[in-house]
Amino acid sequence: MSADSSANLPATLKSLPADMELVLKVIPMPADCNANGDIFGGWVMAQCDLAGSVIPARYAKGRMATVAVNEFIFKQPVRLGDILSFYSKLVRIGRTSVTVTVEVFAERFRAQGEYIKVTEATFTYVAIDDDGRPRPIEKT
């Protein structure tokens, strides 16, 4: 392999983020594949939304809704058999909203113990009342 082609390979990591919380771990199944045989991006987005909601739920202490996908980047394809680890970190707490980042790492089926960042995203969630209207988040 030439030096030029190795520059296009994703960087493999031996460890996962220490400054973020593991909020979800999942293995995609064959039903989650797209027409190319990779995992469908919409499935990855849905899992990121679920993972992203874990930290805001602690602050909302009640109903909440996703109000924005501020950023979403697919860095590498997710493959059948990958073990996906979703890490999240608090970015900001507003009056009614919580913003978090989510980073997704794949442990490839044939490369156990090595991780590749496949997705990164930023989500904003808003605390809502029983009528679906924004409500203040209690500061603790």
Please identify what each model-predicted range represents.
Residues A3-S6, T12-K14, A18-L24, R79-I83, ...:
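HotDog/MaoC-like acyl-thioester-processing domains
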Residues A35-D38, A57, Q76-P77, G113-Y115, ...:
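Short histidine-centered beta-strand/loop micro-motifs
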Residues G42-G62:
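Active-site helix/loop of acyl-thioester processing domains in fatty-acid/polyketide metabolism
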Residues L24-V26, P30:
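A positional/architectural concept
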Residues A31-A46:
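A conserved, well-ordered hydrophobic junction motif at loop->secondary-structure transitions
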Residues K61-P77:
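Small beta-barrel nucleic-acid-binding modules, principally OB-folds
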